[in-house]
Amino acid sequence: MKVSQVFISAISVFGLATSVNAQNASNTTSNAAPALHAQNGQLLNAGVVGAAVGGALAFLI
């Protein structure tokens, strides 16, 4: 496995973990604005897409 593959995978996992943490934080805050929930939902989606793309790139590189 190349260094670039490990690097891409690490970034993907970090992005996913960060977005999940943001989503959980907004869910536990009762007075959070709806816009904040929507933004964190987009972050979560970006993390999932990033992980998928990173995984695909790891096979291609």
Swiss-Prot record:
Signal peptide residue numbers: 1-22
Upregulation: By multistress. Expression is controlled by the MSN2 and MSN4 transcriptional regulators.
GO cellular component: cytoplasm; fungal-type vacuole
Organism domain of life: Eukaryota
Sugar-bearing residue positions: 24, 27
Keywords linked to the UniProt accession: Glycoprotein, Signal, Stress response
Family stated for the protein in its record: To yeast HOR7.
Miscellaneous comment in the UniProt entry for this protein: Present with 784 molecules/cell in log phase SD medium.
Function: May play an important role in the response of cells to diverse environmental stresses.
The protein, known as: Protein DDR2
Protein's organism: Saccharomyces cerevisiae (strain ATCC 204508 / S288c) (Baker's yeast)
